[in-house]
Amino acid sequence: MSQLTYAKIDQTILDTLTPPKKSYWILVFLLLVGALIGAACWAYQIAVGIGVGGQNNPVAWGTYLINFVFWVGIAHSGTLISAILHLFRAGWRNPIARAAETMTVFAVCVAGLFPFIHLGRAWQVYYMFPLPNQRLLWPNFLSPLMFDVIAISTYLTVSSLFWYTGLLPDLAAVRDKSTGTRYKIFKILSLGWTGAHEQWRHYTRGYLFFAALATPLVISVHSVVSWDFALGIVPGWHTTIFAPYFVAGAIHSGLAMVLTLMIPLRKLFKYEDIITIEVLQNVAKTIVLTGLIVGLAYGTEYFIAWYSHNTIEMEQFRWRALGDYRWGFYFMVLCNTLIPLLFVFKKVRTTIATLFIISLIVNFGMWWERFVIIVGGVAHGFA
């Protein structure tokens, strides 16, 4: 990337803004069909009841909440990766920073759908928000679920500002190469950016401020998500390790999702000179670190249960490894901790195919981790 000029990079990126090909519209059509199928399934659930989604007693939190935690983790990791690497002046973050931040904004929107879908009476969702109403009903602000609403709304606001601030020079570059209606749109979006020295000075300070603000905010917000479980009395959930455990898992899954998204786009848009193999290597090395941290969290959970001599806790973790959902537990450990260790070998982390496959495996594993926590945590009765 050091051999590229800024003009060449701009032109490479701008080349992707040409009118889309037929294959693009086919993909859009397929995604639209998928969305319509999902809407039809949701309408069926509203008509019949949420039991069709697998919610039952004792597993009242099913796949909807699994998906919620998974996508919130992806959302938090994008900004966290970009912000932390910016604070540490890691230059290799630049080619993937915008993608990670964009992934964050859209993942928050996806995550927000699942509590809404999970509601039996979705048309009364406004009761979840502190809005004045004639029935004088107010949310319970002591509930972790209300913590979620406030924390994620705050996070969406800050991450969107962080993302948009970083985009300003890019939007101006598109504006300068556009004509007609596109020029007018990007002129508004670029907020008068001209690239003057004074603008760059304010830009770098503002971007640094948002990075410094976003880093602790992301950690605190995902800790709040973990409190949905940790503040309950369910064995396996009621533990103080959940906050760092969830944050580490979010970064782990987010790094894997960056690889999952960047590798196909790198090939499709011919970004090989910008998103170099060295950049992908660094992401893979970081996945090794986060995978070891997640593995440490798995072991620490068992150690805490054993050391506490709490028979119910010990039974919960024994059942996790030997009970009905033991396959999910071992699949989780394999995908999240053991397989990422293959990135230790240079041949593995410099081969595009293995990078992509292992990133998919980590994403599957992180989804199953949430399954093991949410479903496995309440499926075992203690009566």
What is the role of each PLM region?
Residues 332-340:
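Core segments of transmembrane alpha-helices
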Residues 1-77:
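N-terminal signal-anchor module of multipass membrane proteins
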Residues 77, 81-96, 264-271:
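Membrane-helix interface/capping segments
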Residues 43-47, 115-127:
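Transmembrane alpha-helix boundary signature
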Residues 15-17, 24-44, 133-332, 345:
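Long, contiguous internal "core" modules enriched in hydrophobic/ aromatic residues
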Residues 53, 86-100, 124-133:
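Flexible loop linkers connecting adjacent transmembrane helices
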Residues 3-11, 71-89, 108, 159-162:
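Central hydrophobic cores of alpha-helical transmembrane segments in multi-pass inner-membrane proteins
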Residues 354-364:
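Central hydrophobic cores of alpha-helical transmembrane segments
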